């Protein structure tokens, strides 16, 4: 595999952004891992999954279409003497994946009123997919309310939107594979400019809000 070798760098007159290769999806994976490490004595068991092959369909033994994560969770439940089916049903998952930030240079690919913007906080998506909701996970209104209440209570900046213009934009995440196991899941992540290019750009505020949201999610419970 050949990837750009340059280091990440500050971008902008105010140095408010970070430019680098591979923000998709390291910019979500890293704060998720750091949030898991920072979590102490959570009310419920927390699991942080850094899974592979998302860009090619989550196939293979290390992708989310595999059972490796769910077998691990089943083993946790059985060790604790609990029913794994009930545990899955009572779980909640954040599918941490980036989204395309509104780019005025390519405005035709976006719906400005329903897009997400760099610098306005972590982005939340009720549903993903393309061509409407094809190949999508569609989070319930109750789950959207739970997550937004949680962030509002701790002043975490967030925004909600869609993955680009209808029938033009769109994208897939691992959320549907988690939902297929009966676990309520919603997509959340950092908006990215120039996604899938050798030099992707994100806003530092959004990255910090992602970390805060993940820590809060691990510690909060209703």
Task: Identify the meaning behind each predicted range.
Residues 1-20:
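Soluble metallo-hydrolase cores and metallopeptidase-like ectodomains found primarily
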Residues 6-8, 50-57, 98-100, 164-167, ...:
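Acidic, glycine-rich active-site loops and adjacent beta-strand->loop/helix elements
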Residues 13-14, 58-63, 104-107, 199-200:
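Short acidic, glycine/serine/threonine-rich loops at helix termini
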Residues 19-65, 71, 213-215:
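Alpha-helical metal-binding/catalytic segments enriched in His/Glu/Asp
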Residues 36-50, 190-222:
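His/Asp/Glu-rich mid-to-C-terminal helical/loop segments that flank catalytic regions of hydrolases
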Residues 42-48, 81-90, 151-165, 222:
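Flexible, glycine/charged-enriched surface loops at secondary-structure junctions
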Residues 66-94:
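A glycine-rich helix N-cap at a beta->alpha junction
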Residues 101-106, 110-197:
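Active-site-adjacent substrate-binding region
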């Amino acid at each position: 595999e050949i990837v750009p070798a340059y280091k990440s760098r500050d971008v902008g007159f105010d140095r408010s952004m970070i430019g680098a290769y591979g923000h998709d999806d390291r910019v979500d994976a890293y704060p998720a891992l750091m949030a898991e490490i920072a979590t102490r004595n959570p009310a419920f068991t927390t699991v942080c999954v850094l899974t592979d092959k998302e860009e090619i369909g989550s196939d293979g033994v290390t992708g989310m279409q595999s059972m490796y994560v769910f077998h691990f969770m089943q083993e946790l439940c059985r060790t604790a003497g609990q029913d794994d089916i009930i545990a899955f049903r009572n779980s909640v998952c954040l599918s941490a994946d980036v989204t395309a930030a509104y780019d005025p240079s390519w405005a035709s690919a976006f719906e400005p009123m329903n897009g997400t913007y760099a610098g306005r906080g972590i982005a939340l998506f009720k549903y993903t997919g393309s061509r409407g909701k094809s190949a999508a996970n569609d989070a319930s209104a109750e789950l959207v309310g739970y997550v937004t209440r949680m962030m509002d209570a701790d002043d975490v900046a967030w925004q909600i939107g869609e993955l680009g213009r209808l029938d033009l934009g769109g994208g897939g995440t691992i959320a549907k594979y988690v939902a297929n196991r009966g676990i309520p899941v919603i997509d959340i992540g950092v908006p990215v400019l120039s996604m899938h290019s050798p030099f992707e750009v994100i806003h530092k505020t959004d990255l910090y809000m992602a970390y805060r949201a993940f820590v809060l999610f691990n510690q909060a419970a209703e």
